[in-house]
Swiss-Prot record:
Pathway: Amino-acid biosynthesis; L-isoleucine biosynthesis; L-isoleucine from 2-oxobutanoate: step 3/4; Amino-acid biosynthesis; L-valine biosynthesis; L-valine from pyruvate: step 3/4. It comes from Pyrobaculum neutrophilum (strain DSM 2338 / JCM 9278 / NBRC 100436 / V24Sta) (Thermoproteus neutrophilus). The modification N6-carboxylysine is found at K126. It catalyses: (2R)-2,3-dihydroxy-3-methylbutanoate = 3-methyl-2-oxobutanoate + H2O; (2R,3R)-2,3-dihydroxy-3-methylpentanoate = (S)-3-methyl-2-oxopentanoate + H2O. Belongs to the IlvD/Edd family. Binds 1 [2Fe-2S] cluster per subunit. This cluster acts as a Lewis acid cofactor. One of its GO terms (biological process) is isoleucine biosynthetic process. The keyword Amino-acid biosynthesis applies. Functions in the biosynthesis of branched-chain amino acids. Catalyzes the dehydration of (2R,3R)-2,3-dihydroxy-3-methylpentanoate (2,3-dihydroxy-3-methylvalerate) into 2-oxo-3-methylpentanoate (2-oxo-3-methylvalerate) and of (2R)-2,3-dihydroxy-3-methylbutanoate (2,3-dihydroxyisovalerate) into 2-oxo-3-methylbutanoate (2-oxoisovalerate), the penultimate precursor to L-isoleucine and L-valine, respectively. It holds the Pfam family ILV_EDD_C. Keywords: 2Fe-2S, Amino-acid biosynthesis, Branched-chain amino acid biosynthesis, Iron, Iron-sulfur, Lyase, Magnesium, Metal-binding. The keyword Lyase applies. The gene is ilvD. Mg(2+) binds at D83, D125, K126, E448. The lineage of its organism: Archaea, Thermoproteota, Thermoprotei, Thermoproteales, Thermoproteaceae. This is Dihydroxy-acid dehydratase.
């Protein structure tokens, strides 16, 4: 039996804790169980969407692994906000907020009940970083387990993901497809439970869980429906008690080098821009100093080697059949891009794990490329700065064909206004659509603009217009899109001062974004600007707006460690 039961002894050992033991006997504990390590199994579960529909089932398999390793597992839930269902609605304001709430609920549950170690099972976009933030915050032995991607859909020979449905709406509004064609894509694009199928935010964060060393190597890519997904659940249950025996805790794993490796992987795969926010937040919880300047430096050296949607044509299940995330990591490791001494929850360095890992004997089929002959010669994401974003902004250049754009501002104080303009055909080639007051404090909650961006792409304007916002983008976004503009409009950032007709220049090569007006005019507008009143005076959204920091700080709500 594993001899790590230390913390839970204060809750469950001794005469004075007899009543505590009574409670656990009521849920099935035996006398022998009280001598075992208590392992929490955190399931981000919900039937309000497919992403986390099956996590309770995975929790059963995790508990099997815990039992095999000599512990006893108890399942606890956390909240889920499904981004895709809330896209373009007031509910999207709760998306990023839920990340921090998830970390808080895990801290409350597991610290209140004295667990010795835990496994976190996440599916959708915010459950994953929320769990990882909690891992480093609690610093108990812990392993992350991804719920897995949904299978791709098919329309004849065409592979479909949920991205196709979002963009089909824009195509229908532009008169390019019929309502019946839209309906057919809607019906076929998401055939199973699991997360969105491309390298959107959920699959990006799953990939980065391996790069960070918080998940078992190879565990990110098997689909939610795969038997291998359940096998990784059992293995994660065993692994967390091995980590406890070895004294491996998340703050030993999440070092500067681990965040560095995750950033390299993000840029090499053209993953979701949301990962920048989440990695900043994870680093914040770990007490690791990692800033946009670090991301910027790394991004200027790393090419894109993965042709995964939305930057390429392939889905996560396609990557899985050629070996999954380790095949990417090994390429980066052999090319000298990774820091191999970073520790993982498996108790070994990522370099040693990758040395042993061998790819399956199947061709890469254009899904992956070499570092020497990459899919794209530049990074997937660029950090921008300039007089429109003094504290930084992000641009997903890996999913755009043009890196430079200069155009005329059309300004909208919110996503709903902008979507109406796109639907009405008011957006023309050469426009820079500016959507503001959608930042962490201003919205509040920094919602994603996928409804607008997908409509723009679906209308055939993806490379003809640009979009700039203090909000966020979905990982499914493609085109010339700049987000996370900091400072945001609500706190008086320069984006609040943009007027219709202003010229804006975006340069993804040099990393600059410029509002082309004289400094004197900018100062005149600043003097005339008044902050808008808060949108909420009570409840969760008001509390969040009061606490949240800016996007360049990860939009966190807790003080620095």
């Amino acid at each position: 039996m594993v001899k790590i039961k230390v913390r839970s002894s204060a809750w469950y050992d001794g005469v004075d804790n007899a009543s505590h033991r009574s409670y656990l006997r009521a849920v099935g504990f035996t006398e022998e169980d009280f001598a075992k390590p208590l392992v929490g199994v955190l399931a981000a579960w919900s039937e309000l969407g497919p992403c986390n529909y099956h996590t309770l089932d995975l929790a059963r398999y995790v508990k099997e692994g815990v039992k095999e390793a000599g512990g006893v597992g108890l399942t606890a839930p956390t909240i889920v906000v499904n981004d895709g269902i809330n896209m373009g609605t007031p509910g999207m304001r709760y998306s990023l907020i839920s990340r921090d709430l998830i970390a808080d609920t895990i801290e409350a549950q597991f610290n209140a009940h004295g667990v010795d170690a835990w496994v976190g099972i996440g599916g959708c976009d915010k459950t994953q970083p929320g769990i990882m933030m909690a891992m480093v915050r609690l610093d108990l032995p812990a392993v992350y387990l991804y719920g897995g991607t949904a299978e791709a859909g098919w329309l004849g020979e065409r592979e479909l993901t949920i991205e196709d449905t979002f963009e089909a709406v824009g195509s229908y509004l532009a008169g390019k497809i019929t309502l019946e064609e839209l309906k057919r894509i809607e019906e076929l694009s998401f055939p199973t439970y699991g997360t969105c199928q491309g390298l959107f935010t959920a699959n990006t964060m799953a990939m980065l869980s391996e790069a960070l060393g918080l998940a078992l190597l190879g565990s990110a890519s098997p689909p939610a429906t795969s038997a291998r997904r359940r096998a990784y659940a059992v293995a994660s249950g065993r692994a967390v008690l091995k980590a406890a025996e070895l004294g491996v805790t998340p703050r030993r794993v999440v070092t500067y080098d681990a965040i560095y490796n995750a950033a390299v992987t993000l840029f090499a795969t053209a993953g979701s821009t949301n990962a920048i926010l989440h990695l900043l937040a994870i680093a914040h919880e770990a007490g690791v100093k990692f800033t946009l300047d670090d991301f910027d430096e790394i991004s200027r050296r790393v090419p894109v080697i993965a042709a995964l949607r939305p930057a390429g044509p392939y889905a996560m299940q396609d990557l899985d059949r050629i070996g999954g995330v380790p095949r990417i990591l090994k390429k980066l490791y052999k090319a000298g891009f990774l820091r191999p001494e970073a520790l993982t929850v498996e108790g070994e360095t990522i370099g040693k794990l990758l040395e042993r890992w061998q790819p399956p004997a199947v061709p890469e089929d254009g899904i992956l490329y070499s570092v020497e002959k990459p899919y794209k010669p530049y990074s997937g994401i660029r950090i921008l700065r300039g007089n429109l974003a003094p504290d930084g902004a992000v641009m997903k250049i890996g999913a755009a064909d043009k890196l430079k754009f200069e155009g005329t501002a059309k300004v909208y104080n919110g996503e709903a206004e902008a979507f109406k303009a796109v639907a009405a055909g008011e957006i023309k080639p050469g426009d820079v659509v500016v959507i503001r007051y959608e930042g962490p404090k201003g919205a509040p909650g920094m919602p994603e603009m996928l409804k607008v961006t997908a409509a723009i792409v679906g209308a055939g304007l993806g490379e003809a217009v640009a979009l700039v916002t203090d909000g966020r983008f979905s990982g499914a976004t493609r085109g010339i899109m700049v987000g996370h503009v900091a400072p945001e409009a609500a706190v008086g950032g320069p984006i609040a001062l943009v007027e219709n007709g202003d010229k804006i220049a975006i340069d993804g090569e040099t990393g600059r974004i410029t509002l082309q007006i004289p400094q004197e005019e900018l100062e005149r507008r600043r003097k005339n600007w008044t902050p808008p009143p808060p949108k909420y005076s009570g409840g969760l959204l008001a509390k969040y707006a009061a606490l949240v920091q800016q996007a360049d700080k990860g939009a966190v709500t807790t003080p620095p460690r």
